Amino acid sequence: MTVSNNGMAMPSVPPKIDCSEAIQDSPKFRATVAQHAMYFNRLENRLNEMLRHITAMIDFSKNYTNTFYKLTVSVNQLCDESFSGNPLASTTFQGLSEAYAHTVNLFRTYFDHSNVVTFTKLSNFIKIELTKVAESRAHFENMSQSMDDALVKNASISRQKPADATEGRNALTAVGTCFAHTTLDYVANINIAHAHKDHMILDALWTLVRESSAFFSKGHATFDEWTAADNGAIADTIQTFAAKSKLIERKMQDVHSLVPKEMFQHPSGMPIEPDVMMEGYLYKRSSNAFKTWNRRWFQIKDKQLLYSHRSTDLEPATIMEENLRICLVRPAPSNIDRIGCFELVTPTRIHLLQADSESLCQDWMRALQRTILALHEGDSVDVASTSPRNKTTSMSSGVTLTSANAISPLSNAMDVTKGRSVSDPASTYTSANTSSISTAAGFSSSTTAFEQVRRVPGNEVCADCGSPAPKWVSINLGVVLCIECSGAHRSLGVQTSKVRSLCMDSIDNELRDVLLALGNRQVNEIFLAHLPPADSIVPPQINEKSARPAREAWIKAKYVERRFAVAEDTRARSSATNRQEHLKHKTSIGGNSSSNGVNRSSSYADVQDAESGGLLDADPWSADLSVPVPTASKRLSACGSDTNLDAIGSSSIDTKTVEWDSVKEACECGDLLALMTAYAQGFDLNALHNGTTALHIATRNGQTAAVEFLLLNGAKINMLDEKLNTPLHLAAKEGHTLPVCQLLKRGADSNLANVDSKTPLDIAMECTHADIVTLFRVTIMRNDFNADFNNPMDETVEAVISDIARRAATEKEQKKTESLKSTSDI
């Protein structure tokens, strides 16, 4: 065995083939033939690499020296990999390699010498010798298959058919004879190739050295001098490396002094990573029924608590708690009969951890408490740096977070250190901000997302007033806002603008893709496409010093009335049309009030308007997502519901001005700018066209960002197409795991059946999409245990769903990277 430059073990020259083994077609013969095939493939690859280098020497004369160096490296690799079994050839190759390397140093002015002879000889060896071996191998494999077929046919002939037996025996004899000759031809070509290999390749390489030496008489003299002086220089180098190796050996003898005198009593040194506050092994009690203790590697990194398995695979760390700001640390209760235990308490669960000693337990508790303190001190700085008019910070759920409430978890943690314990985590946070509970966001990941979103063109200032360094975002509009404008957006209601904090709220991958695809500059180009001259804008544009009423008036005109998204004459015509349609619609509703209430023939139904209940603002994986809906409301018209009447009353834009074809194409390719343009011009995202909706198309094509955009902007999650398929049906059919996760975590009904009486679970099982089937089953399992507030099943289900979603996102990213790489290669 030899070792190549990349550290991989390479097989040496295969053993010679015994002809008797070849006639018998024994397993040993097959194995030896396979080794020779691999050997010649490797040899051909290396020779082709050398030919490419020689061609480069011819074509790029100015880079001759560098290309010659690459050829030298290739010769070294060829010697190590293919000629280690032949000492004479190996020695000769080493001498040639040294000559090539010396040529690089001496002939800096050497341009475009004739390398045709060398190239021709090596090419002839590949085209003649190696091609014969390849053709013989192909004939051998074909005859081997024919031989196997003849043997099977002969073995299956009945004794009762002597004629067939004779015919089969004759055929077997003929095929066997032909196979034997083909095998021997193959062996002969292999042996001939090995015989010609040494002298042909050596002769080709020596030709280049000989011609170079003849062309440069001075170089020939230099070669003689170099040969005489070479041994001493190499010996000195070896002695230098030997001295360095002995020094390293002596240093390695002192490594045992690093072992501490008291193991498992104190943290083992400072963390290597600068952003890691503390790290080490802890035991974590699982939440399953067995309550097993598992040893995991924990880190307090980027103000998050992470843990990972001890394995040879470098897997990404799992985030135990993304937002330590809403957590507290306390010693374990007295009923835990294990030393060094402590608890990390969140509003919804309790993590029980164990250190290797009581001193390490105290170190971990202090480190976590310092992290929580740093988080709250950071919040205090943010609140102090805001405008004096905004003494309280309004969170995503609409609850006002005062500075006292922000410190309440920390105060509880401080009480624990003084000996006062908290028995119920839920009661501990009764007075805390409820939005912090639903915002279990990763501080590190939010910071990363914050930086990514801020790098989008236009996001360095507020989208509405131009204030610098905005820290809030309207997730459905895709614009970044200052804190004053975010308050005005929040007053519009979540049906118009859903405001989140870039620093404190969770931004998952799909939402991040939406924000990165839009941005202030492009969204303003859409909503301000028909902005009149500055002196005739009503209401006037705002700036960072504008008062709250002016902000509200401008933002309402921009996003609710969409006054500047379409031309003024178009808005005037569409306003009259909409008033007529509104009156007709009210008349039709009044006339049909005595009937069943909804005309099924107009369009297909939305089964459950989950978004109207505020599910988009709740914890996506909370256990209480299911909203009971009366039977009579399960067939609401997609285009004739009360929500559409409100939209007609509030917007004076004709939805017919937006072409369905452009929306369909945008959903198929994930063009969020086109979708935002259609939405700004009044397109009804729940409208049914040709028996389908925009959400159905985006889901069917696996466009997760488009699905996220549509759901954020009011697309009904359980909408039915002409075959009574919900988007969940289509995602399960196409095997799109991420859209299934998106729909399930927003409360999509997985029990609805289409015209074929099949639920999404039935379709996923038919199409054998294992991950999607698992998602449906664990969701059903979670719903079965929904009555228990802190049952261990919730954590297990969340872990399974998160793992599947993470794996699907990773696979999607890998496929995208491979596609881009293949495109660039083409």
From Swiss-Prot:
| Top-level division of the source organism's lineage | Eukaryota
**Keywords attached to this entry:** ANK repeat, Apoptosis, Cell membrane, Cytoplasm, Endocytosis, Endosome, Lipid-binding, Membrane, Metal-binding, Protein transport, Repeat, Transport, Zinc, Zinc-finger
Q: Per the database entry, which stretches of residues form a coiled coil?
A: none
**In residue numbers, where are the C4-type zinc fingers?**
462-485
State the phenotype upon gene disruption. Answer: Causes a delay in cell death during embryogenesis characterized by a decrease in the number of cell corpses at the comma and 1,5 fold stage and an increase in the number of cell corpses between the 2-fold and the 3-fold stages.
Q: What is its main location?
A: cytoplasm
Query: What are the site positions for Cleavage?
Result: 382-383, 609-610
Q: Does the keyword field hold Zinc?
A: yes
InterPro entries for this protein:
ACAP1/2/3-like (IPR045258), AH/BAR_dom_sf (IPR027267), Ankyrin_rpt (IPR002110), Ankyrin_rpt-contain_sf (IPR036770), ARFGAP/RecO (IPR037278), ArfGAP_dom (IPR001164), ArfGAP_dom_sf (IPR038508), BAR_dom (IPR004148)
Record localization: Cytoplasm; Recycling endosome membrane; Basolateral cell membrane; Apical cell membrane
Sequence ranges assigned to domain Arf-GAP in this UniProt record: 447-572
Summarize the subunit comment: Interacts (via C-terminal ankyrin repeat) with rab-10 (GTP-bound form); the interaction is required for cnt-1 recruitment to endosomes. Interacts (via C-terminal ankyrin repeat) with rab-8 (GTP-bound form) and rab-35 (GTP-bound form).
Let me see what the UniProt entry remarks about domains.
Answer: The PH domain binds phosphatidylinositol phosphate (PIP), phosphatidylinositol 4,5-bisphosphate (PIP2) and phosphatidylinositol 3,4,5-trisphosphate (PIP3), and to a lesser extent phosphatidic acid and cardiolipin.
Q: What is this protein called?
A: Arf-GAP with ANK repeat and PH domain-containing protein cnt-1
Q: Which gene encodes it?
A: cnt-1
